[in-house]
Each structure stands twice: as C-alpha cells, then as structure tokens.
C-alpha cells in the first residue's frame, strides 16, 4: 500500500480511516480504537492526514504533526456534499479525501497551543457572562411580581436587593440569597479573568497593535488573536469581514441583484464583540463631535454621516465591518493604526 493521503473520521473512541494513493483512489479502509490510532500515527510513514474541524481535531492535528505528518482540517459543512449515498463513518472518511482534492476548498488553519488556551479563557468568560445574565433576569422577574423594579446591571441589582425587601415573603428572600452570592462570585471571577487578559495583551505586540484601532480593547484584541489562527490566509480585507459575517447576504440572478442583511456567518462571539466595540467608537465620535467638527478623524466623520443617512444600528454594523478590515490590514502589515 502506497498511501499519500489519509482521511480520518474522528470520534471519542472509534476512528474510521481511509487511505488514498497519489491518484486519489481509495486503496484501503480501517477501523481503529483510540489506542490503535495513537500507535498508527507513530508507525505510519509521513502522509497528509485529513480530518473534519470538529471537537478534538486540533489535538489530533498537533499529534499528527509531531510524528511528521501533514495535518489538514476541513470544515464539516463543505465536506458533506462529497458524501455519496448513505452517511456512514467510512463514507465520511472517503468524503474527506475527495474534498481535499477540491482546489477551491480552503482548509481550516490549525491554532497553536497558546491560541487554544487563550480561546478557552474567552469561552469561560462568555459562559460566566451568560450565567450572570440568567441569574439577574431570574431575580428581576421574580421580584417584579412584588412591585420591585430593579435597575440594569449586576452592581445595581445586588445593591437594590439588599436595600429593598419590603413586601417580599421570607421564603423567597431566603431562596434569592444564594443567587445573589452567585452573581457577586461571577463578578469577581470576571474581574480576575479580565485582569489576566490585560496582562496577556501587555506582552503581545500583535494585541498592542490591534488596540490602536478605535473601538478595539483588550477583549477584542485577545479574542482576535485567539480565534484567527492565520490572518494572512485572507487574501483581501473584505474576505475577513465576510468570514466574520459582517457583509450582506446576497441573492442574485441574471440582471437582478439583491443584498439583504448581514450573513451572520463565522464566529458569532467575535462578531458580537466587534459590534460592541463599534457602538463604543460611535458613542465616542458623538462626544468628539460636540467639541467641534474639526476634531473628528476621517473615520468618525464617515460613520457619523452614515448614521445621519441611515440608522444608528446600521452605522454601528458598518463600522464593525470597517474595523474588521482595518484589523486585517494592520495585522498583515504589522503596523499600528494611524487616524487621519
């Protein structure tokens, strides 16, 4: 057997492996346990290892690379059309080998271990923010039934709950106490994690460069470096904005061209963070405009004029799109953003 490329359908305990020769013809198939697959990577001569970009894919990509193989991760959505007839593990492994031969199908860049760890911090932070919001909404909804209106924000709700408990039955007050403790604990965890991200950003030149862009702070800068394995893989800045789902969805045919709302494809967390950053930059532009039009940068003038012609939300999304393009340019050129 002279296999030059190997398709692997990953799972927790069983790995389906297909072997293809230089002509792309599948010459053998195997079904391996986890231990057998680990030994296989050590003993198999160097080859291209093709896998779906799914859970554990980065671990196996790093392991394959350590043993001299050339790992390749493909997006599962784009591999699916190459599955013939019924879906089985063997069919999925075969489809990976067919998809790899498509010149228009770009592989998913493999993240470094540091990028994976940094992305893990952001996933933990995201989960804490979600949990905190759920607890606050629960307390707010329950107390609203007793005529208590709570302010927005975690700090406001904790302070108000300690001040106002008149008319609330004691059993409910007792049940809300651990929820309040949980909200305060999550607040402390978030502050600690944000300090950790700040320390990481201080020592990373790429993050420092990103933070020269209006609306980009520690959270966006660290999230970008963690999530985008290789920004040079985007040939143009517009491709990067499209990858983030910040470009219009298109439905065109013949002479008719229709552009809809933004596609919202790609990394939703990055898109949300960029949108928050854009709203912050837009608010700053308004404050700057109050000091005089002559104090505005060209980017601020552009977004304020766009807001006057359209809508605040559309202007914020357009600015997020612009920020994504600036991020790609400053990163590929390795230079700070210079406001004009």
Residue ranges of each PLM-predicted region?
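A detector of single, family-specific signature residues
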Residues: 1-340
